[in-house]
Structure formats: structure tokens, C-alpha cells
From Swiss-Prot:
PANTHER family: K(+)_H(+) ANTIPORTER SUBUNIT KHTT, TRANSPORT PROTEIN YIDE-RELATED. Its main location: membrane. Gene3D superfamilies: Regulator of K+ conductance, C-terminal domain. The keyword Repeat applies. Keywords: Cell membrane, Membrane, Repeat, Transmembrane, Transmembrane helix, Transport. It comes from Pectobacterium atrosepticum (strain SCRI 1043 / ATCC BAA-672) (Erwinia carotovora subsp. atroseptica). HAMAP family: YidE (MF_01016). This is Putative transport protein ECA4401. Residues 191-276, 279-361 form the RCK C-terminal domain. Belongs to the AAE transporter (TC 2.A.81) family. YidE subfamily. GO terms for cellular component: plasma membrane.
């Protein structure tokens, strides 16, 4: 059998075994995608026993490409809401991530000083315990630059391999302990995130208001400040028995009924100004008005603001809501359209059909994946990750690496949405498929590489102690920060899990957190919020520790 056929066959075996292990449930909790790592360790051990040799270069390429696929699709998924998340809660989330990194470094220093663990070993255990491969590379590089022998530098890799599996299990254990300790109901946490935080947007509501304020008599809608905001849309007006779609120039009369869409606080302010909330129906049923949802797929309208389309003036149609990446937004005049946006239209049937033709409404396009933008994004991400970042006082340049670079680029491209005919929108099913494929490839190779020496070091060497040290470095900071964030910070459980996974730059942990509630984006959003800073700190920390240990 050729090297390629053998390697692919082994990876397939690892994936099948690992996914099967991941489906096991103990008290309702399983390893999920993390089971692939243990499938890899088992197959790697058997391959080592029977002296089955796999191509290391090929495995390395598959491992890195799998990681790139995973982080890129995560970035595309959370990109539309990432920057608003950063403004709203980014400081708090990154502060907790910083605390996690700091506490892990403190535990590492204590173990090194109290137990006299050799420097390469403790740095390797530290990198494995926090499941950060770039940290391992940075530590090995600085040890080499500081004059350590090749044998000592290689010991760091051994320590990493011993600590890595329990590093992944440790964070999953902490997530499970947090769930048990605080009696978390995951479905309730997801609902709380969607309603209270509204994906960092307030949930949109509707009310019907009767105009009783005499000061509004004869004023155009655009002349009423509360109705001229970007936070409220007046999508219907009923006068007598006539239901109409109002324009900014429509004159208000006493006794008119207005159908308003907006956030709770904005609607309450509008009610206080306009009049009284009423139960009178402003339904389009039985009238010549219709409400339909159409999707934006026409390249000609991408990037254009809603006001530029002049839908009300030209077609007597109002956009009452805009759904972007699952988030309901007020369709303000300043909002720019992106590929995949879903518009809630109110108007006459023929007019809505005309507007649908303008914005595209080609449902089949949403199921198509443009591969050109995918590889453009990956290529740009790899280039960004390879750019050296020189920090004064450090003997080596820092880099975002093959994980950080594609993530940052994907976040930016996901936020932009489209450039010309290139759309970075990806159907959820396609995004999930690529993401799962990436993480399975990555974990399969990590497991295969660790499996060869894992059992021997565990049974005949100091492996058990190394695993124990790694467990302390993994669990103590995560548990401390998790309890602090939940009790004092009142952090949503799914957001907390994503933040913990991001602070460890741990894709398998994120996959596990996403699996807790597959339809909620809370974990992925908080992961992406803290990941860039956490990756930078994880790369810096072993270098700082090496300098610290050698100078004290």
C-alpha cells in the first residue's frame, strides 16, 4: 500500500473510532468531537506496536489544513456579529481570558520552583496543558536561541504530548463541573442569550399605538423625532377602515393607528409620545396588503443603503425588519445590505414581487458555496499569520500563525459580507460540514502523533506525574475563572464555555461547547472575541517564562 493510501486509511479509521467514542454518554455528557483525539491515540499506539510508519510531512500538512479549515469557518460564522460583540462585552470577556492565562503561568512557575521540574519539560507541559501548538513552537525556538541542546528542546515536545490529551479533557471537565455546580439548564441559557442579549441586539417587538397627542395632528411622520430614528420603523398605518403603508411624508391624524417595530425601550418611548397602546388589529389579512420575507442575493444591491433603494417612494413597500446571520435588526435607512440578508416586506403583492426581483430573492443561491472566496480568505489568512511581529526585548518574532491568521481574516471578511461578486456568506450546513471536517482531521493527526510514546511514557516513565502537573495547569485557572465569571460576572453559561475555550485557544473545546446547543452562536461568538488576544498571550507566555526561569 502506498504512503498516501496508508495515511488516508489510518485517518479514516481514527475518525470512525473517535467519533464513535465521542458519541458515548455518561450521565448525559460525552466527549463529542474530542473523542477523535483518543481514537487517534489508540490507533497511534497500535501502529507503533506493529511498526507501521506514516508519512510525517503528509500528517503535518493535514493537521495544519484541518486547523485552518476549522478556525476559518468559525470566523465566517461569527464575523457579522463579532465587532458589535467586541464593543458591547469584549473588554469583560478579554479580562477574564487574560486572568486565565495569568493564573496558568502562576501555577507553572510554582510547579517549576517547588518541584524542580526541568525547564524544557515544564514548558512542554505548560504548552500541552493549554492545548496551544504555537506556544510549543515559540518555546522550542526560544530555548534554542538561549543555547539549549537539541535533546533538551525535544524533551519539550514529549512533555507537550503527555499533557495535551488531558488538557483537552480538563477543559471539558470544567465545563461539565460548571454545569453541575450551578445546575445549568442549557436550553434556558440559550434562550436567555437570544432574548436578553439578542445576539448583542435587543429583541425586536411590535406594538399598535393610537395617536392621541394633539401636537402630532397634521405632522409628517418624518417630522416626528421619535419616528424618524433608525431604531423604530412604522410599517403600517390604519385610518378608519383603510390600512396603508406609510411613507416619511404621510401626514398623521388624530385617531390613526400606527404599527411600530423596534426594541422594547424604544417602543415604550414612542408610546409615551404618540398615545396609547391598543389591541386593534393592523393585520394585513383581508386587505390588499401582504407581508413577505425575501432574501438579498442580487450583487447590484449589495453594499447599498436601504434609503438608496427608495422602496417606499417607488413601490409603496416598507422593510419592517432585517434578519442578518440569525439576528433580527431594525431596518434603518442607514443599514447596508449584505448577501443573505432576509428582509420583511410590507406592501401590495405586485409591489412586493417587484422589490423581490430587485433584491434577488434567489433561494437556490443560499445553498450554493462559492469556493473562490473560501480559498482567497484562507490564503490571505495564512499570509497574515506568517507576518513576523517584532517585540522589543524578545529574541524571536511573534506570529499569529496558521490558526490566528485565518481567524482574523475570516472575522473581517464575514463582517464585510461581499466584495463585488465575491460573497463570504456560507450556508450553515456547508459551514458546519467544513468545520467538522477540519477539526476531525486536526485531532486525528494529533492523536496519531501522541499515541506512539504515550503508553510507554505513561507506564514506564514520569508520564503520570507530568499528566498530573498538566492537569493542575489546565483545571485550576479554568475552574477559578469560571466560578468567578459565573458568580460575580453573572455570565451566560454558553458564553462562559466559549470564553474558556477561547482563552485556551482550544478548537476541540469550542466544538464541544457548540455541541451543547447547536443552534446557539453564543459560544462561538465569545470564543472569537477572546481568541486573538489569548493566542498572542499564549505565544508570549512560554517565552516570558523561559527568560524568567533562566534569570531567577
Amino acid at each position: 500500500m502506498s504512503d498516501i493510501a496508508l495515511t488516508v486509511s489510518m485517518l479514516a479509521l481514527v475518525a470512525v473510532l473517535g467519533l464513535w467514542i465521542g458519541n458515548w454518554r455518561i450521565y448525559g455528557v460525552g466527549l463529542g468531537i474530542g473523542g477523535v483525539l483518543f481514537g487517534g491515540i489508540i490507533v497511534g499506539h497500535v501502529a507503533h506496536q506493529y511498526q507501521i510508519q506514516l508519512n510525517d510531512d503528509m500528517l503535518h500538512v493535514i493537521q495544519e489544513f484541518g486547523l485552518i479549515l476549522f478556525v476559518y469557518t468559525i470566523g465566517i460564522q461569527v464575523g457579522p456579529g463579532f465587532f458589535s460583540s467586541l464593543r458591547v462585552s469584549g473588554l469583560r470577556l478579554n479580562a477574564f481570558a487574560l486572568l486565565t492565562v495569568f493564573l496558568g503561568s502562576v501555577v507553572t512557575v510554582m510547579l517549576h520552583k517547588l518541584l524542580n521540574i526541568p525547564l524544557p519539560i515544564i514548558l512542554g507541559i505548560f504548552s500541552g496543558a493549554v492545548t496551544n501548538t504555537p506556544s510549543l513552537g515559540a518555546g522550542q525556538q526560544i530555548l534554542t536561541d538561549l543555547g539549549s541542546s537539541t535533546a533538551l528542546v525535544n524533551q519539550m515536545g514529549t512533555g507537550y504530548a503527555m499533557a495535551y490529551p488531558l488538557g483537552i479533557c480538563g477543559i471539558l471537565l470544567v465545563m461539565w463541573l460548571m454545569r453541575v455546580l450551578f445546575r445549568v439548564a442549557v436550553d434556558n441559557e440559550a434562550k436567555q442569550f437570544e432574548t436578553s442579549n439578542g445576539q448583542h441586539h435587543e429583541q425586536l417587538l411590535t406594538i399598535n399605538v393610537s395617536v392621541t397627542n394633539t401636537n402630532l395632528q397634521g405632522l409628517a411622520i418624518q417630522d416626528v423625532p421619535i419616528l424618524n430614528r433608525d431604531t423604530i420603523v412604522c410599517s403600517r398605518l390604519k385610518r378608519g377602515d383603510e390600512l396603508m403603508v406609510p411613507s416619511p411624508h404621510t401626514l398623521i391624524q388624530l385617531g390613526d393607528y400606527l404599527h411600530l417595530v423596534g426594541a422594547k425601550n424604544d417602543l415604550e418611548q414612542a408610546r409615551l409620545v404618540i398615545g396609547n397602546e391598543v389591541e386593534t388589529s393592523l393585520s394585513t389579512r383581508g386587505t390588499d396588503l401582504h407581508v413577505e420575507r425575501v432574501v438579498v442575493t442580487n450583487e447590484k444591491v449589495l453594499g447599498r443603503k436601504i434609503r438608496e433603494l427608495n422602496l417606499k417612494q417607488n413601490y409603496d413597500v416598507v422593510i419592517s425588519r432585517l434578519n442578518r446571520a440569525g439576528v433580527e435588526l431594525v431596518a434603518s435607512n442607514q443599514a447596508s445590505l449584505q448577501f443573505g440578508d432576509i428582509l420583511n416586506l410590507v406592501g401590495r403583492k405586485t409591489a412586493i414581487d417587484a422589490v423581490a426581483d430587485i433584491v434577488g430573492n434567489a433561494q437556490q443561491k443560499l445553498q450554493q458555496v462559492q469556493m473562490l472566496p473560501v480559498f482567497i480568505g484562507i490564503g490571505l489568512g495564512v499570509l497574515l499569520g506568517s507576518v513576523p511581529l517584532m517585540v522589543p526585548g524578545f529574541p524571536v518574532a511573534l506570529r499569529l500563525g496558521l490558526a490566528g491568521g485565518p481567524l482574523v481574516v475570516a472575522l473581517v471578511l464575514g463582517r464585510i459580507g461581499s466584495i463585488g461578486k465575491l460573497h463570504w456568506f456560507m450556508p450553515p450546513s456547508a459551514n458546519l460540514a467544513l468545520r467538522e471536517l477540519g477539526i476531525v482531521l486536526f485531532l486525528s493527526v494529533v492523536g496519531l502523533k501522541s499515541g506512539g510514546d504515550f503508553v510507554d511514557t505513561l507506564l514506564n516513565g514520569d508520564g503520570v506525574w507530568w499528566i498530573g502537573y498538566g492537569a493542575l495547569i489546565t483545571i485550576v485557572p479554568l475552574l477559578a475563572v469560571g466560578i468567578l465569571a459565573r458568580t460575580l460576572g453573572k455570565m451566560n453559561y454558553l458564553t462562559l464555555c466559549g470564553m474558556l475555550a477561547g482563552s485556551m485557544t482550544d478548537p476541540p473545546a469550542l466544538a464541544f461547547a457548540n455541541g451543547l446547543h447547536p443552534t446557539s452562536g453564543a459560544a462561538a461568538l465569545s470564543y472569537a472575541t477572546v481568541y486573538p488576544l489569548a493566542m498572542f498571550l499564549r505565544i508570549m507566555s512560554p517565552q516570558l517564562l523561559a527568560v524568567l526561569f533562566l534569570t531567577l
